[in-house]
Amino acid sequence: MKPLLPSQDRRLLLLAGSGLALSGFAAAAPSASAGGAGDYPKAPVKLIVPFAPGGPTDTVARLISLKLQEMWGQPVLVDYKPGAGTAIGVDFVAKAPADGLTFGMVNSSFAVNPSLRKSLPYDTVKDLAGITQIANLQLAIVARPDAPFSTLAELIAYAKRNPGKLSYGTPGAGSTTHLGAELLKREAGFDMLHAPFKGSAPAHTELLGGRLDLVFDPFLSVLPYVKAGRMKMIATLGEKRVPGYGYPTVAEILPGFHVSALLGFVAPRATPPAVVAKIHADTAKVLREPEMRRRVEEQGMEVVASTPAQFDAFVQSEMKRWSRVIAEAGIQAE
C-alpha cells in the first residue's frame, strides 16, 4: 500500500521533531535581550494547562514552572483549564493579553484539533505562536501475553492472514495513539478494529481480561504490565528505541515511521518576539540541566527544546500529516 507521506516529507518531519533537539536551539533563536525583554517578567506569570491535573504532562508543567519561578523571581502559577480536547485552555491563551504574562502548555491535540473538530474558537496558526517543543512522549503497542505474535512483523503477517479479526484499544478517538494506529494500518497494509475508551485504564482492563488484542498507549503507562508479564511489548512508535530499554521500534520494520505525542509551550501570536525568545531560552536552559532532563525522561519523554520557529514549523507539518489520516480514516471527535 502507498505510504501516506512521501519520503521527503517524512525526512522533514523527523528533522522537525527530533534531530533539532537541544543542539541547535541557540543559533536559530532570536536574541532574548532584544526589544527590552531582558527585564521580563515584571509581574506574576500564568501557565495555562489545558488538561486536568495528574499524569506525566502535568508533572513536567509543574517541574518547569518551579524552575522558571526561581530564575525569574516572579511567581509562575499553573492554571488548569481542561475541556473540549484542550480547546478551552488553548482558546484562553489565544485571547490573553499578548504581554508574555500568560502562555500555555499544549499537547498533540493542538495539531490534531483543526482537522478533528468542526469548529474551534481560535485559529491555531494565526492566533498562537510556538515558544518551544519541550518534549516528545514515547508511545507503544502492547498485546495480550497469549497473543499469537510477539513481534511487529508477526503481528502484521497475522493481521493480513486474518483481516478484521484483531481489535485494539486507545485512550480515546482522535488521540495520538489512535492516529498512530491508523497510520500504521495504512502503511503496513492491514486492518483491525478500533475500540476507543475514556482513558488508558479501561483499555488496560479490557486487554488484561482478554477482550482486546492490542492497546496503543504511552510507553510508561504500559511498562509495569510488561515487566510483570501481563502484557507483551510489540514495538515502540518513536524514531529511536526508548533509552535504557531494548524494545524495537516500528521504524525497524517500516523505515521512516515515527509517531510520538508532542508537549510544548505557546503564546498569543502578538506576543513580542523578544519575549517569546526569552521564555524559550530560559525553558531550554532549564531542560539542559541533567537533573531536569532525567526527571522529564522518567515521565516517558524525550527532551526536544526546539526554537519558536522550529516548533511552529513542526506543528504545521503535524497538522498536515494528521489532517490526511483523519480524513482517510473518517475519524471524528468523541
Name what the model sees in each region.
Residues L68, W72, P97, M105, ...:
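Sec/Tat-exported extracytoplasmic proteins
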